[in-house]
Every structure is written in structure tokens, then in C-alpha cells.
Amino acid sequence: MIVCAAVRLHIDKTNEDVILCGPRHHYIYKQLEGLGFEPNKGYSRVMDGFVTNTGKFLNRTDGLVYAIQVGQVNANIRDEFTKGIKVELYSEDLW
């Protein structure tokens, strides 16, 4: 089960990758501001995605496949995926 939106970031100062979580991706960027980061300074965004209840990070594409497999999205989303219309998951698709 996907439990939160997530962003994988590379922090320049520590040369480490971190994953920040929140209910929606834009809240995560607000967290960065709260931590003193200016937009796109001191870090690079590696990837937007989601975290599962087991702590696994999934990118938007893998997140969509996973959410369909576990029944976490509605029939409209599944149909759009099957038709090739939808290829990425957004938090609005989940909650």
C-alpha cells in the first residue's frame, strides 16, 4: 500500500541521497524551504515518487503499476493505464 508522496533528493553539502515524504509532493518542497534550502540550491531533485508501507520508494511509473496491483486506485485510473493514456501516478489519484 502506498502511504505517502515522496521526493528523492541529492543533498550537495553531504553528497547523500535522502527521501522526504508528505501527503502531496508540493508539501515536500515546502519542507525543504523550512529546512533553509532555497529553490534548486543546495540539492538536486533526483525523482518524484511514493513510499509504500514497507518503506520502498517507487517512482511515478512504478507507483502507478503498484497502486493498480494492490487495488489502491479507481477503475477510471486503471482504464486510462490499460489504454496507455496514463503512465504516471499522482497523489491526487490516491487521495
Residue ranges of model-derived segments:
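Linear-motif-rich, low-complexity cytosolic tails and juxtamembrane regions
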Residues: 1-48, 52-95
